[in-house]
Design a protein with these regions (language model features):
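F-box-proximal linker/hinge
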Residues: 24, 39, 49-108, 120
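A generic tandem-repeat structural signature
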Residues: 89, 96-196
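Short, conserved beta-strand segments within well-ordered enzyme catalytic domains
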Residues: 47-51, 70-74, 109-113, 136, ...
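Short helix-loop-helix/strand-helix junction enriched in hydrophobic and basic residues
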Residues: 11, 26-44, 56, 65-66
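Acidic/glycine-enriched edge-of-secondary-structure segments
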Residues: 44-49, 377
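N-terminal Skp1-binding subsegment of the F-box domain
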Residues: 1-33
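C-terminal capping region of solenoid repeat domains
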Residues: 80-83, 94-99, 171, 175-185, ...
Length: 594
């Protein structure tokens, strides 16, 4: 039937139909129908997403999809965001850029996350891709403003330059002046991560000559008194990240900012607010009724002033804020913002055990009751109860992402002193479409039994300081059918769960374990048993087989790959394949010889 159907349509028709299929997993399914569909999909694929840059080689991707226009790559594991991945681990993008520079000369978009990007990479991008339009560097490192200057000077069709949360070496603030005077195509510019000043005159000229600029996110070095000037040059902005605020309130600055913002009739997103002075907040009230996104995660504004601001934002769909909002502010959010989809509450003092704000579980309960469209939560707090989690689960069965971070590890239900198993069990039982879950607090193997039983659509699970034994990890790996990424730290999970579920690991993107009970011997056995997996032991104490095989390793990163062992492993990373024992023996002999 599939064969007859495939033969009944001309290739041009199928190519047109396939162009409407956006999800990678759906396109992958299409390519499996028959050989002709495989070939058509292969030649008409324009976008490629690779969640692990070591899962496949650049050459393989280029052979498989010869006409790609957009590439998205991820490098380091997610736990790198919490400094759990040692410096120098890897994630180098240069081999990809080098391969694509000769084969994808028509490439238009590159999006990178947690990768090492050098100035040489950026210069090669600028030189190789003549119609290059989009560069997104999210949480990347290794490059400087010299590399950005090469992009600015050469990429004449660039529409998007986004450096979100990247670590950039600010060699010079004049790199923006490298955009040619004839350049007018910019739509998105995010330089919020830069630490040093940029040339304001160059920034002003750039903003003035780009009529399609929709998103502008400035760094804190851009003073508030100059923001009004930029807004007057770009009243068409839809998204704005403010610069730094001045310590003293100046009436002329307040008035100028208020007037300039009132002229931005399309503005829907606000962020920045570094060192925001509460007296300046009323200047943004004129745009609040249109706001759908508000990022206050850098604003040390107290609850009283936040309440006044949020009460002006009835259309808000996404809010990022510090815990200064407190329960009272979240109650106002719940009563005002009925269209809220995403809430992230970050800690103002993450390393202080004593509560410095009035934020409890009740704030999140209020939002779950008042915001019927809420589907994504990241919530840092210092206390939680099973009853609150059960209420949240029943209020919001539409939740797809739930990440709860209790500041103190292994904190129980503070009212009953019981583990939080029942509460998280309710989350996975009631939220049928849950895709991402982060656990915290006192948890036993029972919660993992709940997860394995109910979380059938969960794709990513993050676990820390939880569980009793290997049984907990076994419940997850054997029960969660859709699991792609599992990251674990400081848990008693070890060899039995790892080896018993070896075949499950081949269906996942990756497993990260640090400070657990996994032995070097188990890692070596897994590597020998599963050739399609890269089992990487990360141990800064020296070669792992210089210690007994029963000795736990510091970290292990396991991922599915069709590329085999990588070639850029530093001295503290060892790949456990069938030849590992021989290599280790030679390494020890060589080291001893020295």
């Amino acid at each position: 039937m599939h064969k007859r159907l495939a033969l009944s349509f001309p290739e041009e028709v199928l190519e047109h139909v396939f162009s409407f299929i956006q999800l990678d997993k759906d396109r992958n399914s299409v390519s499996l129908v028959c050989k002709s569909w495989y070939e058509i999909e292969r030649w008409c694929r324009r976008k490629v997403f690779i969640g692990n840059c070591y899962a496949v080689s650049p050459a393989t991707v280029i052979r498989r999809f010869p006409k790609v226009r957009s590439v998205e790559l991820k490098g380091k594991p997610h736990f790198a965001d919490f400094n759990l991945v040692p410096d120098g681990w890897g994630g180098y993008v240069y081999p990809w850029i080098e391969a694509m520079s000769s084969s994808y000369t028509w490439l238009e978009e590159i999006r990178l996350k947690r990768m090492v990007v050098t100035d040489e990479c950026l210069e090669l991008i600028a030189k190789s891709f003549k119609n290059f339009k989009v560069l997104v560097l999210s949480s990347c490192e290794g490059f400087s403003t010299d590399g950005l200057a090469a992009i600015a000077a050469t990429c004449r069709n660039l529409k998007e330059l986004d450096l979100r949360e990247s670590d950039v070496d600010d060699v010079s603030g004049h790199w923006l002046s490298h955009f040619p005077d004839t350049y007018t195509s910019l739509v998105t510019l995010n330089i919020s991560c830069l630490a040093s000043e940029v040339s304001f005159s160059a920034l002003e000229r750039l903003v003035s000559r780009c009529p399609n600029l929709k998103s502008l996110k400035l760094n804190r070095a851009v003073p508030l008194e100059k923001l009004a000037t930029l807004l007057q040059r770009a009243p068409q902005l839809e998204e704005l990240g403010t610069g730094g605020y001045v310590a003293e309130v100046r009436p002329d600055v307040f008035s100028g900012l208020s007037v300039a913002l009132s002229g931005c009739n399309k503005l829907k997103g606000l962020s920045g607010f570094w060192d925001a002075v509460p007296a300046y907040l009323p200047a943004v009230y004129s745009v609040c009724t249109r706001l759908t996104t508000l990022n206050l995660s850098y604003a040390t504004v107290q609850s009283y002033d936040l309440v006044k601001l949020l009460s002006q934002c009835p259309k808000l769909q996404r809010l990022w804020v510090l815990d200064y909002i407190e329960d009272a502010g979240l109650e106002v959010l719940a009563s005002t913002c009925k269209d809220l989809r995403e809430l992230r509450v970050f800690p103002s003092e993450p390393f202080v055990m004593e509560a410095n704000v009035g934020l409890t579980e009740q704030g999140l309960v209020s939002v779950s009751e008042g915001c019927p469209k809420l589907e994504s939560v990241l919530y840092f707090c210092r206390q939680m109860t099973n009853a609150a989690l059960v209420t949240i689960a029943r209020n919001r069965p539409n939740m797809t992402r739930f990440r709860l971070c209790i500041i103190e590890p292994k904190a129980p239900d503070y009212l009953t002193l019981e583990p939080l198993d029942v509460g998280f069990g309710a989350i996975v039982e009631h939220c049928k479409d849950l895709q991402r879950l982060s656990l915290s607090g006192l948890l036993t193997d029972k919660v993992f039994e709940y997860i394995g039983t109910y979380a059938k659509k969960m794709e990513m699970l993050s676990v820390a300081f939880a569980g009793d034994s290997d049984l907990g990890m076994h419940h997850v790996l054997s029960g969660c059918d859709s699991l792609r990424k599992l990251e674990i730290r400081d848990c008693p999970f070890g060899d039995k769960a790892l080896l018993a579920n070896a075949s499950k690991l081949e269906t996942m993107r990756s497993l990260w374990m640090s400070s657990c009970s996994v032995s070097f011997g188990a890692c070596k056995l897994l590597g020998e048993k599963m050739p399609k997996l890269n089992v990487e032991v990360i141990d800064e104490r020296g070669p792992p087989d210089s210690r007994p095989e029963s000795c736990p390793v510091e970290r292990v990163f396991i991922y599915r790959t069709v590329a085999g062992p990588r070639f850029d492993m530093p001295g503290f990373v060892w790949n456990m394949d069938q030849h590992s024992s021989m290599r280790f023996s030679r390494q020890i002999i060589t080291t001893n010889g020295l």
